[in-house]
Amino acid sequence: MERENVVVEKRGGIGFLILNRPEVDNRLSQDFLTEISHTLDELNVDDEIRLIVIKGAGKNFCVGVDVAEILGLDEVAGRNFFVSLSEMYKTLHRVDKVTIAMVQGYATAAGMGVASSCDLVVASEDVQFGATGVRVGLFCMTASGVLLPRVVGSQKALELALTGDLIDGKEAERFGIVNMVVPRERLESAAVELAGKILSRNPVSIVMGKRNFYACAEMGFDEGLDYSAEMYGVLAATKGAKEGMRAFLEKRKLSYK
């Protein structure tokens, strides 16, 4: 598909999906949301890449939905807009490849949702996160109801959504919203370094492990253990897993790059 608001770059097995509306701080229009979803689907089946990094062009990662567009919508059109937002979150959550959000500046409202929907988050020291919908007369429904409770717990998620307060990188790291905080000039190198560690592992184990992780999160204790045992059996019988185990027993280095 032709892209207007998204740029894709491929380097060393990494697909960079760049949110490219810097003139409006990467605000998410409905067309933009659809474009992100389609691009994620394309990257998920692209054999050239094994991992996806999402970054925002300009000084801010993403400041949420395009409020000017929403203002002109009636109830039906507004619902359709937010269905597109939810579908983008679902697409981001279900891709087989590991996703890393590379976040700088403001990541607010749906922008915080994009980051929280990724598997891992690397942020710059100047980052500001917030479920800020309430500041403009809206409410971060998906962030407070679905995305953030999985990370920070229900009470903190609701507090953030009710107040619209901003939190900095260190506080976000303390709450588990981000995996690491680095100086802004090191942001991309830190994300690439983290990606490199993952890319050095058995690609089949990464895909199956991610799938197992999220599946078990939706299951009860016994069901999760049973499912994991089945997945483990399948994984251990694969060629890549057997080669990894042989290398370990033979005390030799192995790279899956």
Placement of each model-derived feature along the sequence:
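Conserved CoA-thioester-binding segment of acyl-CoA-metabolizing enzymes
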Residues: M1-A57, K90
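Glycine- (often His-adjacent) and acidic-residue-rich active-site loop
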Residues: T34, V45, G56-T91, A107, ...
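Crotonase-fold acyl-CoA enzyme core
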Residues: K90-V204, V234-T238, E243-R246, R252
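Short, charged, surface-exposed hinge/linker loops at domain edges
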Residues: K210-M219
